[in-house]
Structure formats: structure tokens, C-alpha cells
Amino acid sequence: MEERMQKTLTNVIDLPQRDRTESKWYEGVQTFMWMTEDNIVEVTFDKEHLLEAILDPKNLNRAYKTVMRNKGCGGIDKMSCEQLLPWLLANKDSLIRSLQDGTYRPNPVRRVEIPKDNGKKRLLGIPTVVDRLVQQAINQVLTPIYERQFSRTSFGFRPKKGCHDALREAQKIVNEGYRYVVDLDLERFFDTVCHSRLIEILSRTIKDGRVVSLIHKYLRSGVINHGVFETSKEGTPQGGPLSPLLSNIMLNELDKELERRGLLYVRYADDAMIFCKSKRAAGRVRDSITEYIENKLHLKVNREKTKASNVNGVKYLGYTFSSINDYKLSVHPKSKAKMKSKLKELTSRSNGWGYEVRKRKLTEYVRGWIGYYYLASLKTFLSKMDEWLRHRIRMCIWKAWKRPKTRMENLIKCGIDAYEAHRVSYSKWRGYWRITGTPILHMAISNANLKKKGYPCLLDSYLEWHPK
């Protein structure tokens, strides 16, 4: 079925193919890397005729598959991903024609607010599915061009790079003797990107004015917030396929300035650390680079949060640095507290979840958390957390048994003597925490039994990443 849909799509978005030996826009070609689903390969096209590359049927087909794979909710028109193919069957000619002649008008994005840990909200802008398709097609052509320009120590939203690469690079720099850091904080970066400055930067590389104009239309498409249209005079709304690339293109200017000054740094999206060998040098760098960012890039630096300090205890991507002989990556205390708070939420006795739902949610969260924080040494911490988590799980099970008679029967099934089972089940002890901490409950709902029933163990999950 899926293969038949892909063949249909290829026919839907098929454009007349030009003979490359006779094509005018193929003259003066240049070779760039091209992203596929599995790798980056080199292809050849002309930067002055990028729109043709964007509208190439193979590129559009790949963009369609990416949009379908990523799913996501609909935009202001409420069109779902499943409705995209029927829409293309009916409207593909007018869509492609409007993109070619410059009459295409992107829809405003739908405002979505996501709560942040600090109590504030992250503003997302969800494009329509059709706009996501077009943005993804643009992204696939521009990414390999800009990948050649981007810095080696820029890790956010890039192929085959990620948070762990950024953390390892930061650890390496610190262990080379750069023990002081400027922890750069850009205030509401995605919401405050200067459109004119970004367009100027784009125009240096993209010589096809039609593509620059199309990107500018997306930047200025506006927002629907609670049913009210708002103009977008600045910012690259998070939520669309183009936003990560545009943010990297903007902050690549900062990367090049840092490299020009000979400074070592690591950047993941708008989260950057600049490394120095003394606190005095870090202070000078903080002041001068703040001036550059605000005056040249027209971005706002949060001066209260942008600090020059020793690297010990600085939070970066959820981790921090600690040293005995050399510097190791550790989980920041705030990240640990957030994890404990989430586990407490997942083991709440009042959420009404059954055993299977709770086990599934716990397992998903534990695997995700360990999969991200496994770079740190966590055996001692996770052993203590396992004790606490199992105690919380026992409370959930004890409450689920409800009636004293049921509790007594289940304790006996677990191998507890009938007298002890009766004593505990009908006791007037107050508090789930107290009663589930007794030796009887530990014997009945043992660690081995919990593991056998499928409840996750933090330490076991960690040891899967660190078998030694």
C-alpha cells in the first residue's frame, strides 16, 4: 500500500525533466553534499537556480516521506498528514505553478505554548502540512550547501551530530586546560531573530532570489494565536522544518567570529559555551562577545544568566563537569531533581493507572533518561534511586489491593505466613510509605518479583550502556 502511494505521489509531483546537457540553469554548476535518508552524498546543481532543485520530483517525494514519517499535528487549516496525498492529487499543479511564479503564499502558523521548567512557556509555531512539505523540500536542498560552511564545533540540528558529541567536545576542551567558561544565554533567540539580518546572510550564499523571497514569506507569514492573527516582524518560529536550519545559519556568524578571535567554543543550537584559561580572560570575552551579538547580529543577550566562571558546576545540556584528577561529565543536580519529580509523578497513587500502563510509562521514561545521561558515572546515584523507586511502586501496588481481605490473600500468595499477612493487612498503621517500608512488604513485593513482573530497574538499564 505504501509503495503504491509513493508511486502515486511521484506521478503527482512529477515535473517535465530537462536534458541536463541542454539546461541553461545547469551551466556554471557546483558540487555540494546531498542528504538522503541514510547518508550525505555529493550531487551537482547551481546555486542560482535552486528553486528547480527544490521542485525536483525526487526531492519533493523525499520531503513528502519525511513529513509523513514525522507526523505531527495540523496547522490552522486542520489538515492531517493522512489528508496530504489526496490534497496533492487535486492541487499539485496549482501548488507547483505558484511556487514557480512567486505567487505562493504560506499560511500563518498556529501558536502552541509548551511549559518550560522555569515556569515560562516556549512558543511554537505549527505550519500547515502543505507548508511543512515545502519547507522540508527547501531544507533538503539548503542543508548540504550550508553544511560546508558550518563549524566543526556546532552540533545542534545537524546530520550525524548531537548533544553527546557537543558534551564530549566540551569535556575534551576543559581537560586541555580551559577551566573557565562563558556560559552564553541568548534571550528568546528563536522569537527575536532579525529578519533583515537573516535575509542579508542568506543572500550571500543563495543567489536564487526566488528562494530567498520564499523563505522571507515564511518568516513573515504571521501567527494565529487563540484565533487572532498576529504579524511576525521578527523570529523564526520553532515547529517547522526550516527553523533549525535558519537558526544555525544565523548563529554561524557568531561561530565564525569566535573562530576569527581564536576562541574555543561548543554550540548546540542557541546554547553555547566559550572556553578560556583564566577568569579574567573569560570576563573580557563575555563583555566583547555580548557587544558583538547585540550590535552586529541584533540579538538579545541575557546579561544576568550569561556568566564567566569556573567550569565546575556549570550546567550544559543537562550535564555538568566535576573533577578529581581530570574533568568528568556528571548529571547536573537540577537534572537529577527533575528526574525524581517525574518518577514521583509516574508513581502517583491517584492517577488511576493500571499495572500495565504504569509499567509502560515508567519503562519508556527510564530508558529515555538513561539513554541520554549514560555518559556520566551513575552507579551510586541510581542504586539509591532504585530503592526509592521500588518503595514508590510498592505503595502503588498496596493501594491497588485496597481491601484488607484482598491484601491478606495477596500476601499469602506471595509466600507470607498467614498470621503475619493478617497482622499487616488489618493493621492500623497510618501512611503508605511507612507500611510499604516494612520487612513483610519487602519480602512479599521483592525486588526480584518487581523485575519479573516487568517493572524497570534504573541500574540495570544503565549497565546495558556500561556492561563493564
List the model feature ranges, each with a label.
Residues R220, K296-R367:
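A conserved non-catalytic segment of reverse transcriptases
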Residues C73, Q83-P108:
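Amphipathic alpha-helical blocks
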Residues I138:
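Nucleotide/phosphate-binding loop and acidic/charged catalytic motifs
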Residues R392, W401-K468:
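Extended C-terminal regions of large enzymes
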Residues S98-E113, D117, R152-G313:
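Conserved polymerase palm-domain catalytic core
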Residues E3, L346-R407:
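Right-hand nucleic-acid polymerase module
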Residues M1-L89:
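Non-catalytic, polymerase-adjacent accessory regions of viral genome-replication enzymes
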Residues L123-L124, T128:
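Conserved phosphate-binding loops in nucleotide/dinucleotide-binding enzymes
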